[in-house]
Amino acid sequence: LLCVFVYGCGVIDKRPSPVYFGGEIVNPTSPYLVLFKDDQVIDSAKLDRSNRFKINFMAESEGLYHFDHSPQFHYVYLEKGDSLNLRLNTLEFDESIVFSGKGEEINNFIVELFLANEEDERIVDQYFQLEPDIFDEKIESIRQEKLAQLSTLLKEVSLSPRVTALINATIDYNAF
């Protein structure tokens, strides 16, 4: 009975599952988009006449991937069964990224977190002149704000423990 329960929860399901990653690149700087997991190429796609691409692959596991549209790249979190669309404009690469489809919530959150971290870097530079205790309070305030945003997201959508841990680690890393 325990085996049926564990199998039913997907804990031991190691079978690959299809993932779709596609979208549109406005003002492309390269004719290709390349998808990586760690440093390994998963697949590449040539942009069509409408600057659209699509990649279908069998995912062994969920995780952090990145796509490269030279000379830029960005991260994307893909899980088994995702069907994720991307739209971006290379003139404002990071600021224009929008995801839609299955997996959009976490990926749009990752983009927002990335952009917020860029902004925080400019703000934190001003804090270096403060006393250590006040500096720590300001940094902790920024961290708590991001954790509150994650908490709100978790109330709206169900995220895997792995991606939740990744986001928590990202928030903590950028606070220290």
Model-identified regions with their sequence ranges:
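A non-transmembrane, solvent-exposed segment enriched in polar/low-complexity residues
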Residues: 10-166, 170
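Sec-dependent signal peptide recognition
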Residues: 1-2
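C-terminal motif of bacterial Sec signal peptides marking the signal peptidase cleavage site
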Residues: 5-8
